[in-house]
Every structure is written in structure tokens, then in C-alpha cells.
């Protein structure tokens, strides 16, 4: 089951294989140590809804790495969706980190509401679904619709996390008003460093407190 995964070891071993000089990922074997059998009933679904507008470049790189690592884990169903004003489902590219990275096309506007609507079809068991919205929340589409969909997701039992950025340092740009409204719905909103992603995933899947991450905003 997902709770049997050693997320810190598995993810940390692979995050380092992005080579900034080559501007590509040089992966090693993916590691997964599962101590229990997995059935459809106890399998988690993790949905990564990734903003590929121009301001999200560094976050896209780290999102692609984490997506491939998660997709390699048999105890998790992973869906990878990229969006600007259009939507691209990159799930089928997740077995090749380089192929996945080049599936992203940076630039364009942002329609977060549209992407969330697309992702809703992948929620089969809300209590076993973790939805990451990786975006600076600079919505160019229907902001009220975005908030309504997130609220409905939360009420159904989905664990929703808004990652404003995945970056090594610095204060990220994000739409503070939308972030505040999401926080009012009980959605944690924060930026995260790549090094803390393993801990974040572990705590989120175990339903643990994420308040220390929110202080990083």
C-alpha cells in the first residue's frame, strides 16, 4: 500500500538526476519497496495538475521528475496533466522522464478551472485521491468556477494541495487573493523545495498536519 512506501528514500534518490548543464534528466533505476500486496481498493490515485504557463518553468522541471517517480510505483495510480489555456494529458509519457519533460510546452495563458474540470474524471475513490494543483494561481479563466470545483473536491473527501511553486529558493510569485480564498476552503497553499517533496508526499498520504509547509509561503 502507499503507506508502506519509503518515500524519502525513493524520491530523494531520483530528484538529484536532473542535470542543469545538459538541461535533461539522467535517471537511475526507480526504487520502490512495497511490504504489502496492493489491491484496487487500497490503491491511491495521485493527480498532478501542472501549470505550464511561462512563469512556471522551474516547477515544471521538478514536477516532471516527481511524476515519473510516482508513476513507477505499482501501488499508486498517477495522472499527469499539463495546462495553460489548453490541456495535455501526459500520463502515457511517464515511463520516460525525458519524453515527459519535452511533453511540456511553456508559455501561453492560464485556465485552471478548465484543467480541474478535466481532472475530475480521474477521481474514483475520493478518500484515496490526492490532488496537487501546481500553479501560481494566476487564473485567466473562471476564478469562481475554480473555487467551486476545489470546494466540491474537498467536500467529496479528496485531499487537495495547492503548490504555488516547486523551486530551490526565493519567494515565488503567486496570486495572493486566490491563494487566500483556497486557504479559506481548507486547502493548504504553499511553495515547496524539491528536497522537501518526499516529506510532503509522505505526510499528505498519511493525512498528517501540513502547517509547517504553509509557513513557507
Name each region found by the language model.
Residues 1-44:
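Negatively charged sequence features
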Residues 48-53, 128-141, 165-167:
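DG-centered beta-turn motif at the end of beta-strands
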Residues 83-88, 167-168:
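Short glycine-enriched loops at secondary-structure junctions
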Residues 88, 97-132, 139-140, 144, ...:
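Von Willebrand factor
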Residues 149-217:
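Von Willebrand factor type A / integrin I
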Amino acid at each position: 500500500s502507499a503507506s508502506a512506501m519509503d518515500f524519502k528514500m525513493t524520491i530523494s534518490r531520483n530528484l538529484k538526476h536532473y542535470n542543469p548543464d545538459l538541461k535533461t534528466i539522467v535517471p537511475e533505476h526507480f526504487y520502490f519497496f512495497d511490504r504489502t500486496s496492493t489491491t484496487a481498493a487500497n490503491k491511491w490515485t495521485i493527480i498532478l495538475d501542472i501549470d505550464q504557463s511561462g512563469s512556471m518553468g522551474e516547477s515544471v522541471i521538478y514536477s516532471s521528475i516527481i511524476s515519473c517517480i510516482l508513476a513507477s510505483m505499482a501501488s499508486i495510480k498517477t495522472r499527469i496533466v499539463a495546462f495553460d489555456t489548453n490541456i495535455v494529458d501526459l500520463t502515457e509519457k511517464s515511463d520516460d522522464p525525458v519524453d515527459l519533460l519535452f511533453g511540456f510546452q511553456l508559455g501561453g495563458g492560464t485556465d485552471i478551472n478548465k484543467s480541474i474540470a478535466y481532472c475530475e474524471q480521474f477521481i474514483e475513490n475520493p478518500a484515496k485521491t490526492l490532488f496537487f494543483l501546481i500553479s501560481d494561481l494566476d487564473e485567466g479563466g473562471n476564478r469562481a468556477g475554480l473555487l467551486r470545483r476545489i470546494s466540491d473536491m474537498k467536500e467529496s473527501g479528496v485531499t487537495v494541495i495547492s503548490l504555488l511553486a516547486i523551486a530551490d529558493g526565493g519567494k515565488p510569485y503567486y496570486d495572493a487573493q486566490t491563494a487566500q480564498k483556497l486557504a479559506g476552503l481548507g486547502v493548504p497553499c504553499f511553495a515547496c523545495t524539491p528536497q522537501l517533496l518526499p516529506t510532503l508526499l509522505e505526510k499528505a498520504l498519511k493525512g498528517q498536519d501540513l502547517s509547517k509547509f504553509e509557513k513557507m509561503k
